């Protein structure tokens, strides 16, 4: 049981807590009442604000919509005014631009094209909106006048600034390709940069708005004339240079043989030099055409529309190309006439030209890509013509060597080298510079097709066979000509000189190697022929040495007195030798052996034989009393006989 005091204390404690809780509850109740009151007040305020906001919205939105409508109306008015201004401006275009169009585009192309753009727009406007308006006719007329002025300006710019390329610059352009050292590229400025830009702008305008291609015809006509005159100027430059300072350097004909004559004996002063100049000039003109045509195409690409470039370029190069082809055909025609005259040295002008044309053909083909077939076929046609005429020249030359009719009146009286031999060798030597070309000519006739499809070895063998044929024909002709001489010894000297000249000429040049391709024993064969003729010549001395040859001498007993018959025989032997020696020396002194080595060899051999025979004869009979006047019969000492033989083949002795 809890004590009364403790229970009383706990009751008071509980009562205190209860009181506190009641106070707290009362505070909370008051707070809730205040909160409710505040909430009611806030709801009332918000309701009032919402009501006012709705009133404001109901009054502002109509105003806003009205304002938007007003702004839209204002914009429409402004656009309408702008359109009206724009339309009205079309009616003023003619008057605003007439002065500029009348004065032309020279010096103010930018402004002029701007005016033309305005006129173009005016034309389009009136055509779409007022096709019956008189203003349309005005602006159309003004547009046509402006277009004509632009076309005229295009022509004027091209005419004024398209200059002929100087020959020196063209030569630099050509030679730049052949220089081994690195050099700056040779740049051709066909038109000043500012002019070029104007021309490009005009051409583009004419293509886009002018609907006219006449300016392309103007372009190719002007540039074609310039190209043609540039090439003709180069040709004229060669002619003038040749008359004053010799033939200009030619990259197309390098390393001309200085020790090899290139022509027959000159009949007309300067004629052969002129042929060289014409040939060199033509070769340079061909190279110039390729380089200038390449440059022209680069220029054309910036001015002419792409789909018209090939056709315009084809037209542009025609005059210059036709000029080259015509000149080439004239060369072929001249060669054909020269063949008829048997002037084969003139025909040789075809060889360097043909070689250069074939070397240049790949570049030619590249330049002419896209041109008409007739244009592309011009060079191959000329090459074929030259191959054909060249092959005919070679064939006729070989036949002419075999059938040369000249005999008596044209035979050298001293037995020296015949003109036919020297000309034949010179002709063959010149072929060395054009081995591939000549071989291709022969191959083209052998196969009836282009020789380019055959290797160089095939052509080389054909050329070797041809040279052997010419040499064989020459040998037959020389044998025939040698029969004109009544003296077999002179005939032998003639053949010896010609055979020796042929052999030496073959050895000095590459001809001997070329001949050896198909005839390995040619050199040995010529040496045998030469030796045979020397032996034939030496037999002419038998009529002299037979008088004193030991086998023909009678035997005398020493100390026995000679009979009259024996003395007379000795006298006849001395006299026969003396007369024969004098006669041969007199005759053969006028003969010629141009080769010093051969001349000395023949003299020495003959001198050795005669001196030995005469010395033995003289030794045997000089002390024999066969005459009272020994000086009458013993006219020469052995040394004198040798001296006389040393003067053979020497008219100055």
UniProtKB/Swiss-Prot annotation:
GO biological process: exocytosis; positive regulation of mitotic cytokinetic process; protein transmembrane transport; regulation of entry of bacterium into host cell; regulation of synapse assembly
Organism expressing this protein natively: Rattus norvegicus (Rat)
Pfam families according to UniProt: Exo70_C, Exo70_N
Keyword Phosphoprotein: yes
Gene: Exoc7
Annotated region (SEC8 and ARHQ binding), positions in chain: 1-384
Membrane association type: Peripheral membrane protein
Coiled-coil ranges per UniProt: 5-42, 63-85
Keywords carried by this UniProt record: Cell membrane, Coiled coil, Cytoplasm, Exocytosis, Membrane, Phosphoprotein, Protein transport, Transport
Protein name (record): Exocyst complex component 7
């Amino acid at each position: 049981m809890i004590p009364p005091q403790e229970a009383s204390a706990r009751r008071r404690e509980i009562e205190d807590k209860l009181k506190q809780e009641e106070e707290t509850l009362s505070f909370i109740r008051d707070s809730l009442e205040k909160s409710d009151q505040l909430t009611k007040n806030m709801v009332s305020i918000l309701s009032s604000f919402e009501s006012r906001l709705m009133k404001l919205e109901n009054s502002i939105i109509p105003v806003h919509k009205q304002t938007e409508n007003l702004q839209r109306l204002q914009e429409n008015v402004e656009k309408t005014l702008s359109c009206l201004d724009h339309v009205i401006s079309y009616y003023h275009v003619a008057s605003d631009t007439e002065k500029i169009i009348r004065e032309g585009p020279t010096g103010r192309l930018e402004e002029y094209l701007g005016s033309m753009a305005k006129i173009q727009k005016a034309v389009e406007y009136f055509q779409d909106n007022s096709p019956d308006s008189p203003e349309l006719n005005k602006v159309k007329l003004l547009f046509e006048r402006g277009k004509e002025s632009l076309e005229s300006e295009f022509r004027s710019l091209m005419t004024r600034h398209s200059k002929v390329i100087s020959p020196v610059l063209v030569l630099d352009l050509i030679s730049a390709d052949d220089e081994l050292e690195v050099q700056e590229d040779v740049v051709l400025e066909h038109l000043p940069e500012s002019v070029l830009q104007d021309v490009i702008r005009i051409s583009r305008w004419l293509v886009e708005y002018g609907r006219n291609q006449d300016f392309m015809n103007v372009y190719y006509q002007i540039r074609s004339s310039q190209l043609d005159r540039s090439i003709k100027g180069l040709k004229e430059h060669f002619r003038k240079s040749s008359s004053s300072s010799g033939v200009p350097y030619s990259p197309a004909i390098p390393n001309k043989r200085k020790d090899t004559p290139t022509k027959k004996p000159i009949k007309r002063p300067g004629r052969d030099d002129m042929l060289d100049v014409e040939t060199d000039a033509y070769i340079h003109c061909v190279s110039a055409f390729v380089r200038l045509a390449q440059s022209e195409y680069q220029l054309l690409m910036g001015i002419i529309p792409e789909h018209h470039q090939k056709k315009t370029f084809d037209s542009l190069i025609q005059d210059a190309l036709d000029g080259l082809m015509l000149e080439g055909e004239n060369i072929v025609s001249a060669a054909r006439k020269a063949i008829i005259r048997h002037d084969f040295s003139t025909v040789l002008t075809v060889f360097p030209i043909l070689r250069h044309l074939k070397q240049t053909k790949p570049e030619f083909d590249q330049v002419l890509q896209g041109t008409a077939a007739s244009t592309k076929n011009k060079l191959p046609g000329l090459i074929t013509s030259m191959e054909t005429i060249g092959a005919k020249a070679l064939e006729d030359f070989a036949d002419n060597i075999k059938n040369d009719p000249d005999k008596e009146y044209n035979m050298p009286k001293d037995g020296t080298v015949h003109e036919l031999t020297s000309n034949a060798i010179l002709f063959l030597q010149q072929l060395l510079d054009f081995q591939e070309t000549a071989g291709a000519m022969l191959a083209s006739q052998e196969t009836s097709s282009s020789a380019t499809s055959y290797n160089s070895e095939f052509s080389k063998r054909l050329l070797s066979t041809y040279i052997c044929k010419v040499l064989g024909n020459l040998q037959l002709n020389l044998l025939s000509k040698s029969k004109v001489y009544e003296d077999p010894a002179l005939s032998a000297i003639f053949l010896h000189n010609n055979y020796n000249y042929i052999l030496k000429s073959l050895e000095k040049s590459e001809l001997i190697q070329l001949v050896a391709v198909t005839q390995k024993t040619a050199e040995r064969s010529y040496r045998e022929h030469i030796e045979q003729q020397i032996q034939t010549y030496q037999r002419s001395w038998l009529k002299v040495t037979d008088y004193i040859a030991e086998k023909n001498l009678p035997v005398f007993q020493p100390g026995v007195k000679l009979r009259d018959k024996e003395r007379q025989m000795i006298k006849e032997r001395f006299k026969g030798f003396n007369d024969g020696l004098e006669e041969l020396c007199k005759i053969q002194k006028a003969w010629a052996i141009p080769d010093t080595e051969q001349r000395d060899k023949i003299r020495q051999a003959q001198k050795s034989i005669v001196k030995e025979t005469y010395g033995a004869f003289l030794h045997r009979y000089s002390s024999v009393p066969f005459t009272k006047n020994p000086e009458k019969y013993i006219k020469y000492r052995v040394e004198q006989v040798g001296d006389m033989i040393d003067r053979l083949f020497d008219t100055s002795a």
